[in-house]
Design a protein with these regions (language model features):
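Active-site glycine-centered loops adjacent to acidic/histidine catalytic or metal-binding residues
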Residues: 1, 46-47, 75-76, 160, ...
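N-terminal active-site segment of His-dependent metallophosphoesterases
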Residues: 1-56
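Conserved catalytic scaffold of divalent metal-dependent phosphoesterases
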Residues: 2-4, 92-171, 260, 269-282, ...
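The substrate-binding groove and active-site-proximal loops of carbohydrate-active enzymes
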Residues: 10-17, 45-51, 125-135, 167-174
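Conserved acidic residues
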Residues: 40-42, 155, 193
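Extended active-site neighborhood of metal-dependent phosphoesterases/phosphodiesterases
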Residues: 53-149, 174, 178-194, 202-257
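Binuclear metal-dependent phosphoesterase catalytic core
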Residues: 212-337, 394-399
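Long, low-complexity serine/threonine/glycine- and acidic-rich segments characteristic of extracellular
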Residues: 303-399
Length: 399
């Protein structure tokens, strides 16, 4: 969720992250209450706070409302940036939430939680820079832990930063991740590994091909649950604020996107007017409940894609920025799509996947561009600007 204090300058562009956290917790609590045929557990994939150690108290208060246990992963922003080294930086996390690497068994699966960010001082002598991968201590522990796990066991691996394929389709290597070849070889020995991560602020699922020595590994990178980092609005991959629900039945695992239903606290008023939300499919009623424009029904997990009619979505991100035109293609963003899914169809025709370097979220662009147009400033005087690319879930078909 990565919340800041409500008084933080970078938390006042649109919506307060702590407010969005409250809505997020309420949604998870209500969703969990509907699940009566199995136990419910949660996993936060890091950055449970944003460099403000006092917010651990708020986070713990939020967890108390959920009604189910939460397992936590250390993110880079969970470290105390006033500390002088990696060990001291994680002390506050450990005091409030426990160890930064551990394992446990649930059902037939073995869960492994790793700290894969090695914090170091930046040019301002603050603990905000980092190397990625495993320290010797964590690597030795991991080998010892898996020594007792049968190779037929499904492994659920969780770390803050992606440990395998990245959102830019660049494979992690020993140059970017300490002990990468070591842990890849170790996990490749198991029948199935699901590698979960956050950090990248966008959604990315990747399935290694049968020709790969990592063909047993599926990569799941999830976006920030409270939305885009600075505005706490739509996430940059084109989803509303929300989270991933993972259903486990023995060794079978499935998942879907769950949009957060609520937005109960108001706009900060830093810009006027608010974005038009021309490409959003829902609005919030007076009670802060998201309702679909098409029929007024509540926003539920049935909302798994965003469709753009012909003329709305330009062929590439660069064309869209330039304001160039229209085309006769229908575009769709299928939120958590991966290569094990079928490609979507339009009027019986299989849609073509748009290259990730060209794909973007028009819904997110409209919102971000609004704040950019109003000249909102971030740290260092940089303007808040739109972003695009690295979206792997956009398809199109000719109308």
């Amino acid at each position: 969720p990565q919340p800041r204090a409500r008084s933080a300058g970078y938390d006042n562009i649109a919506y307060h992250s702590l407010d969005m956290c409250e809505d997020f917790y309420r949604d998870m609590r209500e969703k969990a209450a509907t699940i009566t045929d199995r136990n419910v557990y949660g996993m936060m994939l890091g950055d449970v706070v944003h460099e403000n150690m006092s917010l651990y108290t708020d986070y713990l208060e939020g967890l108390k409302t959920l009604g189910f246990p939460m397992f936590n992963i250390l993110g880079n922003h969970d470290n105390d940036y006033t500390a002088s080294n990696d060990t001291d930086g994680r002390r506050k996390f450990e005091q409030h939430l426990g160890p930064t690497y551990y394992s446990f068994n649930l059902g037939r699966q073995h869960y492994v939680v790793l700290d894969n960010l090695i914090m170091k001082l930046d040019s301002n002598s603050q603990l905000r820079d980092y190397d990625q991968g495993l320290t010797e201590e964590v690597w030795q522990w991991l080998q010892n832990d898996l020594m007792y796990v049968d190779r037929s066991t499904t492994i659920m691996l969780a770390a803050h930063s992606p440990m395998f394929m990245g959102i830019n389709m660049a494979e992690r290597s020993n140059n970017t991740q300490n002990h990468r070849s070591d842990y890849a070889a170790l996990f490749s020995k198991y029948s199935k590994v699901h590698a979960w991560a956050g950090h990248a602020h966008t959604t990315f699922n990747y399935v290694y091909p049968e020709s790969s020595n990592l063909k047993n590994i599926e990569v799941h990178t999830v976006a920030r649950s409270t939305g885009e980092l600075w505005t706490n609005e739509y996430a940059i991959n084109g989803t509303p604020r929300g989270y991933t629900v993972v259903e486990v039945d023995g060794d079978d695992i499935s998942w879907y996107f769950k949009p957060t239903l609520y937005q109960r606290n108001g706009f900060t008023g830093k810009t006027s007017p608010q974005p038009e939300y021309k490409h959003r499919d829902y609005d919030f009623d007076d009670d802060g409940v998201a309702r679909l424009r098409r029929d007024g029904s509540a926003l539920t997990e049935s909302y798994q894609m965003k469709v753009y009619k012909p003329g709305q979505y330009n062929n590439t991100y660069d064309e869209m920025i330039a304001g160039n035109a229209t085309n006769k293609y229908v575009y769709v963003n299928v939120f958590l799509w991966d290569d094990k899914w079928e490609k979507p169809k339009y009027n019986g025709t299989t849609m073509t996947k748009v290259g990730y370097k060209d794909a973007y979220s028009l819904s997110a662009y409209e919102i971000n561009n609004h704040y950019y147009t109003y000249g909102y400033k971030l740290a260092g005087g940089n303007e808040y600007g739109p972003g695009g690319g690295n979206i792997h879930t956009i398809f199109r078909a000719y109308e």
